[in-house]
Amino acid sequence: MQDHNLPFTKAIRSQIKLRLAIIGPSGSGKTYSSLLLASALGKKIALIDSERNSASKYADLFKFSVLELEDFHPDNFIEAIRSAEEQKFDLLIIDSLSPAWNGHNGALELVDKAAARLKTTNSFAAWREVTPLHNRMIDAILRSDLHIIVTMRTKTEYSLEKTDNGK
């Protein structure tokens, strides 16, 4: 049996930062809800807008600073988080994190590019390159000194069904 020297220490209460995800379909109020909650938690609010300037419609209702992102490479989200930290914001809203997955230079597009570069149809090899990038972005969110709220879009599923009268 191996001797494990992993000492436990007494737990000490410390200030923890909010990590919240608000998930819903387009138009469900994710941006408004995140701004409303952020206003109660912090005085200086930063918002990363990856939804084509959609947060601007709330500029008259809430006080916040915005950064428009058009390239959703994980490193751009990391850079934006660090910028918000350096500018001493209290809270950061990432509206939305979805393009980091399925947007321009998001994870899915990066996998396609890596697979093409590697000349393979085996996406596992491509994911080997992309997963560490994505994990670094998630780690930046989790380790930040800011309260962070992220919004994410759910897919809307449409179903066509026939009624009793055949319509």
Over which residues does each language-model region extend?
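Conserved P-loop
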Residues: Q2-L6, K10-I94, S98-G103
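P-loop NTPase motor core
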Residues: L91-K167
